[in-house]
């Protein structure tokens, strides 16, 4: 599977980069961006992660199938783009796809765990802020739709998980934030709030205060 091969390479090179950084004498803050493809269609996984889930207990979409002719104009156009009108997707097909997606998410979790393990080994775990984000969600069969490109919650909302020194543990923020906020946030974290601005104006707003409970 090319996705697995690719992500294994990303994890390997990220691990090596961290080991190289630990051997370096440069004391400046670092930014390591490890861009994994998982979870992403095609929904293919390995037996190891598939077996973490009971297939019969995989949940089905909360919003049932909506006939293409009854969908909004954009959803109709997208359905025809992916040729959804040419295929009948059974309940078992849906359950299998969702099962694989969950398994792929667990594989991604394991890859992140590898990087966290290296941070611990090089003594940087306690002073490193770790952020998990994604560029899009996944419809997962909701409304009868799949993949991204949909103006609905499942496709538009992405995770933003943050852990590190000074970050509140176990807090779930209800305010809307954006991926645009990442750069000013990283800037504040790296400069202890000194406000060094790489460009002016800088899109987005720093979330550093929010992460700390301000």
Regions found by a protein language model. Give the residues of each.
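Active-site-proximal cap/lid insertion segments
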Residues: 1-12, 16-28, 33-176, 189-201
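Zinc-coordinating Cys/His ligand positions in small cysteine/histidine-rich zinc-finger domains
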Residues: 179, 183
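Short, intrinsically disordered, charge-balanced linker/junction segments flanking boundaries
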Residues: 204-214
């Amino acid at each position: 599977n090319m996705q697995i091969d690719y992500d294994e390479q990303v994890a390997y090179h990220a691990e090596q980069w961290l080991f190289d950084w630990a051997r370096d004498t440069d004391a400046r803050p670092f930014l390591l961006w490890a861009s994994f493809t998982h979870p992403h269609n095609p929904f293919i996984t390995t037996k190891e992660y598939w077996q973490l889930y009971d297939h019969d207990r995989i949940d089905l979409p909360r919003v049932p199938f909506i006939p293409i002719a009854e969908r909004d104009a954009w959803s109709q156009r997208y359905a025809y783009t992916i040729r959804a009108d040419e295929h009948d997707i059974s309940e078992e097909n849906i359950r299998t796809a969702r099962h694989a997606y969950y398994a792929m998410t667990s594989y991604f979790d394991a890859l992140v765990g590898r990087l966290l393990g290296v941070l611990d080994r090089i003594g940087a775990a306690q002073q490193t802020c770790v952020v998990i984000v994604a560029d899009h969600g996944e419809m997962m069969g909701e409304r009868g739709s799949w993949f991204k490109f949909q103006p609905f919650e499942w496709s538009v909302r992405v995770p933003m998980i943050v852990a590190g020194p000074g970050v509140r543990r176990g807090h779930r923020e209800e305010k809307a934030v954006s991926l645009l906020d990442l750069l000013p946030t990283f800037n504040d974290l790296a400069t202890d709030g000194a406000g060094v601005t790489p460009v002016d104006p800088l899109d987005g707003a720093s979330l550093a205060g929010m992460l700390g409970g301000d």
